[in-house]
Amino acid sequence: MRVPIAVVGPTATGKSELGLALAEHLDGEIVNIDAMQLYRGMDIGTAKLPVAERRGIPHHQLDVLDVTETASVATYQRNAAADVEAILARGRTPVIVGGSMMYVQALLDDWEFPATDPAVRAKWERLLATEGVAAVHAALRAADPAAAATILPTDGRRMVRALEVVELTGKPFAASAPRIGTPRWGTIILGVDRDTAELDERIARRTALMFDSGLVAEVRGLVERGLREGVTARRAIGYAHVLAYLDNEYDLEHAKERTLIGTRRYVRRQRSWFRRDPRVRWLDGADPGLVTTALALLGDAAAAPATTERTTQ
């Protein structure tokens, strides 16, 4: 019986490469679980694998939103779960790859989301609109310090949602999250990490490569498609900083530095989140035998070799 495999962990550790290798070995299909890779056209700054590098393996939950649309954890959960179940029904192995923390938990733990109240939400949205993300972050820090430490300080929408839940339930935002138990579908969760110094160097190289590969031009093109109006997309690491550069808030070198610092901070949050989950089986992304080690950890789930002819998606 096939079970899904999840490959999670911090940014730039090598999750995508391992996910591809496992999908090849397990006759699998990839389900993306990186929130910013949901967006069409956000390719360079999210390190999205080009189609030519996907080895003919079908990928799901990539390029499903326009930059003007708002990403929703609940919507992702519903759509990605349908993808996982369809892959299983085809007799293939879902390989879930990415590092967006709440998206991972929502999918694998079947998170039931609290109700919403338009009046309460509108109050916090007014604060966001009139005083900005710093004021919303301060309010969240006062109401729920743990949530404020977990949610990206520039993610106004998610902070508004957290404040709404705290006000409606009288409990911390995390209290609405599922308890950690057996993952949905019996998913086996692999985590990929690297030595901190090595990962910092990889992030620096990747950030430089993004700018050298045309991130500024990509953002300019997305502005023409409505990026500035996008509630979620415009706040993505790198994209927000290039927008600030285009608005003459600072120069290009400062945009690069802010992108690098933002990525490193995000990595620390990812590490803290995933390391708390005892179900994750950790792997060293620098291990030359990474794929072999991962397959050994998977045990019986990796016993059936790939046999189905692939079609490029």
UniProtKB/Swiss-Prot annotation:
Top-level division of the source organism's lineage: Bacteria
Swiss-Prot/TrEMBL keywords: ATP-binding, Magnesium, Nucleotide-binding, Transferase, tRNA processing
Any GO molecular function: ATP binding
Cofactor: Mg(2+)
Reaction(s) the record says it catalyses: adenosine(37) in tRNA + dimethylallyl diphosphate = N(6)-dimethylallyladenosine(37) in tRNA + diphosphate
Positions with a binding annotation for substrate: 11-16
Any one of the GO BP annotations: tRNA modification
Pfam families: IPPT (PF01715)
UniProt xrefs under InterPro entries: Dimethylallyltransferase, IPT, P-loop_NTPase
Residues at which ATP binds: 9-16
Site (Interaction with substrate tRNA): 100, 121
Oligomer status and interactors: Monomer.
Function: Catalyzes the transfer of a dimethylallyl group onto the adenine at position 37 in tRNAs that read codons beginning with uridine, leading to the formation of N6-(dimethylallyl)adenosine (i(6)A).
Protein name: tRNA dimethylallyltransferase
Lineage: Bacteria, Bacillati, Actinomycetota, Actinomycetes, Mycobacteriales
